[in-house]
Structures are given as structure tokens and as C-alpha cells.
Amino acid sequence: MRFDILTLFPEFFETPLRIGLVGKALQQGIAEVHCTNPRDFATDKHRRVDDEPYGGGVGMVLKPEPFFAAVASLPRLDPCEIILLTPQGQPLNQALLQELAQKAQLILLCGQYEGFDERIRQYLATREVSLGDFVLTGGEIPALALINGVVRLLPGTVGKVDSLKSESFQAGLLDYPQYTRPAEFQGHKVPPVLLSGDHQAIARWRLQQQLVRTWQRRPDLLAKRPLTAEEQQLLAEGLAEQHPGVNDVEK
């Protein structure tokens, strides 16, 4: 898979893309990342990529010409998405990462200043993506988050594929609690079921923990995911164990 990042600060990506699973994936050729500076495509002697907004206002707006020219210079793979990283975009979530991981190429447009000329949004980008309901100084951090989230889904990046299936958001639920040695630490013990060797009981406990944790922390996720009768029962039992007297779950 090929990532092309259009950024005024290509040096921002040098270290993060060399470390961890993403760094290994790039070394192994599972994915490749290329940075292009739109300033290299500015045509005036000062290599300006921004200008004052028409109609007045504070700040500077990124000009369309350098970004259109930079994108036109890139090799294209199919299917490709040209993604504008902006707070106005579609929220980045696991479902979107899974969709983007099916593409052959992602071109990421990183903004600065007051944002992009609207013609970049309308006639160049094919999608807008947001990291959340907050504003950063630029699109570089969202670009890194998107690359990290997509690359780890590519075949060969994560050693155990099953670990991807059970983690948070993959089934519309948060992940279950994880424990390792020692079995007791400062008086806090690992749940006995995890030491029992009963794989069916462990799977049931883990699903119950996912349901309870999601209900407590992200009820919005459960609103989007119909529960089976078994899951409703597991959730009710799990909540009753934590909060005696709770024996009904709103369906």
C-alpha cells in the first residue's frame, strides 16, 4: 500500500515512521510512505503556498495551485483516495480504517494556518477525515494516526491476526481486561476464570467484560449494535455482579 503525504513539514514524519510496527511494516515493504512538500510546486519567487482570504478575516488560507500541482505529480494506484485532514471531516474510527485499508493508495493533504481554499475541498479531495471535535495546528498528527491505524490492519504487519479480531471496536465493543504474571500483585488477584484453563468459560467471561465495559464507558456503541439474547443476559449478569440490585438492561 502506498501513502503520499502532502505537508509543509515533511521532517515531522521522519522519526515516527521509523519505529514500532509501522516502521517494521515499511522496512518489509508492506507499505510505503512518501512525503511531498506543496511549497516545491509554488510558482512565485517567494514559494508562497498561502494568501489572505477573500472577504477579509484573520489568518492565511492555503492556495489551490500548489496542492493541485503536487497531487498531479504523484504516481497513481487504483483504488485511491485523496483525503483532506480537517476538523470538518468524517470522524476517524475503526470502521473507516478498515475501509481505507482496502485501498491501494491514500493521498493525505495536511493543512496549516486557517485551512484550505474551498476548491481543494470541492474539486481535489475525495474524502474529508477528522481526528475528533477539536482543532490542532495542522494535519500532520491526524495523518500519522490514520497511517498507523491503517498499516496495522495490512496483512503481515501484526504477527497474530486473531489479536486484531478481539481488540476494541472490531466487533462494536471495547476490549476486555487483560492480565499477565504475577497472578497476584499487591493483593490484587487475576480473575480465577482466566487461570482455570476452561476456554469456553474464558471466552464467555471476556465477552461479558466487553459488554459491561462498553455499556459503562461507551453506551453510544451499544446503541448501534443490537445485542443477542445471550449477550443481553451476559450484560445483565455482569452489571448485577458489579452493582447488586441491577437486574435489567434496557434493550
UniProtKB/Swiss-Prot annotation:
Which biological process annotations from GO are given for this protein? Answer: tRNA N1-guanine methylation
Q: Which UniProt keywords apply?
A: Cytoplasm, Methyltransferase, S-adenosyl-L-methionine, Transferase, tRNA processing
Write down any Gene Ontology CC term.
cytosol
- Which of this chain's residues are annotated to bind S-adenosyl-L-methionine? G111, L131, G132, D133, F134, V135, L136
Know the name of this protein? tRNA (guanine-N(1)-)-methyltransferase
Q: Which PANTHER family match?
A: TRNA (GUANINE-N(1)-)-METHYLTRANSFERASE
Detail the disulphide connectivity of this chain as listed in its UniProt entry. none
Catalyses:
guanosine(37) in tRNA + S-adenosyl-L-methionine = N(1)-methylguanosine(37) in tRNA + S-adenosyl-L-homocysteine + H(+)
Please give the Pfam families that the UniProt record associates with this protein.
tRNA_m1G_MT
- Identify which top EC class this enzyme belongs to: transferase
Explain the purpose of this protein: Specifically methylates guanosine-37 in various tRNAs.
First-listed, main subcellular location of the protein, grouped into a coarse class = cytoplasm
Q: How does it assemble?
A: Homodimer.
Q: Which family does it belong to?
A: Belongs to the RNA methyltransferase TrmD family.
Query: Amino-acid biosynthesis as a keyword?
Result: no
Compartment(s) where it occurs, according to its Swiss-Prot or TrEMBL record: Cytoplasm
| EC number(s) reported in the record | 2.1.1.228
The GO terms this record gives for MF are: tRNA (guanine(37)-N1)-methyltransferase activity
